[in-house]
Amino acid sequence: MLTAIDYLTKKGWKISSDPRTYDGYPKNYGYRNYHENGINYDEFCGGYHRAFDVYSNETNDVPAVTSGTVIEANDYGNFGGTFVIRDANDNDWIYGHLQRGSMRFVVGDKVNQGDIIGLQGNSNYYDNPMSVHLHLQLRPKDAKKDEKSQVCSGLAMEKYDITNLNAKQDKSKNGSVKELKHIYSNHIKGNKITAPKPSIQGVVIHNDYGSMTPSQYLPWLYARENNGTHVNGWASVYANRNEVLWYHPTDYVEWHCGNQWANANLIGFEVCESYPGRISDKLFLENEEATLKVAADVMKSYGLPVNRNTVRLHNEFFGTSCPHRSWDLHVGKGEPYTTTNINKMKDYFIKRIKHYYDGGKLEVSKAATIKQSDVKQEVKKQEAKQIVKATDWKQNKDGIWYKAEHASFTVTAPEGIITRYKGPWTGHPQAGVLQKGQTIKYDEVQKFDGHVWVSWETFEGETVYMPVRTWDAKTGKVGKLWGEIK
């Protein structure tokens, strides 16, 4: 007989927590009730720890103790970095506390006994302090499906023979089912930017009109918070074919639609890298599919149906081209924003969301994992890029005077101020209306068309222009400001 513990100890692993040494063994299997520094590490399972803790001082490489199929590979699972392999007997081997980002396989992959599945670590659900080690647990195939049973059930692996659970697996199709890398900002567990939403009534599928990946968005968004430009907009979720950034809790108000009701009741999902020419249409569609899969998971978690009332577009609430690239591909380039076309776009999103809502798997090409640099350093770089220094006025070829200026503007005009796309001219298409009391952060000032204007870039990459007072080009005299500048 060969047990998993025998297998690991022969490789030099040492046991740090052994159920055979707990009080009441074997009758009261796994009752440990371990406390340290005021923390009960077994509280969730009622004091039980039906698992072995082992560690190695020689290597962090964690080998699979049996062959099988990966059914979970989650950086933020119930045991922190959580990896689960189902063996030939249909029982599940749980490898817990792995280093986040270290897992070598994705859900659906085949694994052979001895394959390195990840790295020994100390991650955990609550981010409590703990020593580096491996939590190894054998969940029975007949465990109930509720969370507590899935987390707390455990067979006595010291009595479980793995001698014949080492059959070679066909790994030729590994990687065909995509498991996205999840990135979490400090706001998920820490401080929040806004208040809780009064209700969750649906989702909005955006295109970011940018070229950044989700991991690149995180330092960029932090930098905007630091310099105050985050008030110009952000969404809760950013996704592409490789990664998902959970920037802010989905049940908190977002600034993603330029519409008070939509911001307070709808969850924003950004399809990343949508800037024309940044990536091929094929790769963009993979980004779109990944985003719709995440949207389906979130909608299902809130018990939302999938229909035209719950799947919405940005251009339903604000004068914008968003979702511009999805629109070009599924409705047609240059097609007008009519009700018929809006419904055509929504119906496409609905069809794909339903596919994932009903259990469809995400299948995309295997792309290289994007390496994340130190976020603090990236924040500093992004802040440096976003700082705008005051300069003297310059004039461009169209006769527009402009200069860089970094400040905030709060509207005081009772009727609000109409904003424009394309440039500082009242004849350009209307972008929207900034209402009394609303504030934006701008980075440039222009003088043209009888007005002084300010402009800023939205979180979707579009520049918006707004007149803030009158201006006489002949005398240089300016009128009363229609708001407050700080």
Curated annotation (Swiss-Prot):
Coiled coil: none annotated. Zn(2+) is required for amidase activity. InterPro entries: Amidase/PGRP_sf, Amidase_domain, Cell_wall_metabolism_enzyme, Dup_hybrid_motif, Peptidase_M23, SH3-like_bac-type. Zn(2+) 2 binds at residues 206, 314, 322. Sequence repeats lie at residues 67-79, 80-92, 96-108, 109-122, 123-135, 136-148, 149-161, 162-174, 175-187, 188-200, 201-208, 209-221, 222-234, 235-247. Zn(2+) 1 binds at residues 49, 53, 135. The keyword Metal-binding applies. It holds the Pfam family SH3_5. Residues 406-474 form the SH3b domain. Belongs to the N-acetylmuramoyl-L-alanine amidase 2 family. This is Endolysin 2638A. It comes from Staphylococcus phage 2638A.
